């Protein structure tokens, strides 16, 4: 039977909500990315520093994960969108763990619901993966019922 892992980074809790929903629905292992540094949680610095770090392609040091990526056939990667990009924690993960020959589903969430550019950027960092789907969610914690409904497609992709 194919094994599935969900790897996610959450900043304000939206991606954490997505991870919790998927963990309750699917047979998968969940891994949260914890960076050594993050932008301020509020104020203008949140947007300036967070956006700058995403645009600049900054690396962050991640807390060690107990994941052997080669043990999984299916990967779900979930993250918030920062300045139209994926956050530094995702970039660091993709650099540290070479993602190759997997079935991959990518979930991005943002205030606008427009995460396509960030999703496409992830695709440039993986090799020979079969992209089985992607989702761009708008403020999942504020639109819980809508988000839950949209997550059905993730289950179907690996079901």
Range-by-range predicted roles:
Residues 1-77, 84-86, 91, 95, ...:
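N-terminal beta1-alpha1-beta2 submodule of the flavodoxin-like/Rossmannoid cofactor-binding fold
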Residues 108-113, 139:
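Short beta-alpha junction loops
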Residues 6, 77, 105-108, 133:
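Structural beta-sheet core signal
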Residues 49, 102-103, 109:
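P-loop/Walker A phosphate-binding loop and immediately adjacent motor/lid segment at beta-alpha junctions
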Residues 80-83, 111:
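Short glycine-rich anion-binding loops that position phosphate/pyrophosphate groups of nucleotides
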Residues 117-127:
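Short, aromatic/basic amphipathic alpha-helical patches
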Residues 130-159:
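Glycine-rich phosphate/pyrophosphate-binding loop and the adjoining helix
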Residues 69-70, 95-102, 125-127:
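Short, conserved loop/helix-junction motifs that constitute active-site signature segments
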């Amino acid at each position: 039977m194919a094994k599935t892992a969900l790897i996610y980074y959450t900043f304000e809790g939206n991606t954490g909500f997505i991870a919790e929903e998927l963990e309750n629905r699917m047979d998968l292992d969940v891994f949260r990315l914890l960076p050594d540094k993050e932008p301020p949680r509020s104020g203008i610095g949140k947007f300036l520093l967070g956006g700058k770090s995403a645009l600049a392609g900054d690396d962050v040091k991640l807390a060690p994960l107990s994941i052997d990526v080669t043990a999984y056939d299916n990967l779900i990667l979930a993250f918030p969108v920062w300045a139209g990009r994926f956050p530094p924690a995702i970039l660091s993960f993709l650099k540290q763990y070479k993602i190759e020959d997997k079935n991959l589903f990518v979930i991005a969430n943002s205030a606008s619901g427009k995460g396509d550019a960030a999703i496409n950027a992830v695709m440039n960092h993986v090799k020979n993966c079969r992209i089985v789907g992607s989702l761009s969610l708008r403020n999942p914690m504020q639109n819980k019922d809508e988000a839950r409904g949209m997550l059905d497609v993730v289950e179907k992709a690996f079901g």
